[in-house]
Amino acid sequence: MQYSPNLAHGTLLRRYKRFLADVLLDDGTEITLHCPNTGSMKNCLFPGETVWFSTSNNPKRKYAHTWEQSSTPDKQLIGINTGRANALAEEAINLGVIKELTGYDRLQREVKYGEENSRIDILLSSDTRASCYIEVKSCTLLEEGSTSGRGYFPDSVTVRGQKHLRELIHMVKQGHRAVLLFVVQHSGINSVSPARHIDVAYSELFTQALDAGVEVLAYQTQMSPQESQILTSCPVIT
């Protein structure tokens, strides 16, 4: 995924009201960014560090700038925009990067499914095999003080994420293939685990999903102000 134009940068001052962040530009101008991340952003907020943002030409938007990436004190790069995870996953599937998800004829986004009024992030289908329902999650929480690069999901209690696991379990029971795909958007994360210390219910449903036959994959993203792309798989530690 290429950014056109390249992402601009500034210095993070503060995040507030959940969806807003103030940034100081090199020329001394202070601007407000839209923060497209509903999580706690635990271990992702570092005032005084560099952030990168995109700019929209849509005149109807209240905030033209969107927070895309952030730097940590040890110069790791984090993808803040959780909405990018779905687009990155779609691109990687179409390019054949995610080997476990090749061999399908059609890819659809945001298709209604399940029993709880849900929409699947990605649906793969073919005339010769069972459909594959894929829920995409962005993983950015690096374990504090970790030397092994262990990442966790979620970074806050997620009732919505719990619902998605129940839906995936249901699809397996209906004879379909179901996949939970973690898109790792933190350059310091080398493995992914369910965050039992944050959301016990999610962790328990995660185990139930594995037992039911839901597949869990994790892939790392290479990021820069010019482009982001999924490159390699990493372990899921349960």
Swiss-Prot record:
What are the GO MF terms of this UniProt record?
A: DNA binding
InterPro entries for this protein: SfsA (IPR005224), SfsA_C (IPR040452), SfsA_N (IPR041465)
A Pfam family annotated for this UniProt entry: SfsA_N
Stored HAMAP family: SfsA
UniProt lists the family membership as follows:
Belongs to the SfsA family.
Q: What is this protein called?
A: Sugar fermentation stimulation protein homolog
The organism that produces this protein has a lineage beginning with: Bacteria, Pseudomonadati, Pseudomonadota, Gammaproteobacteria, Alteromonadales
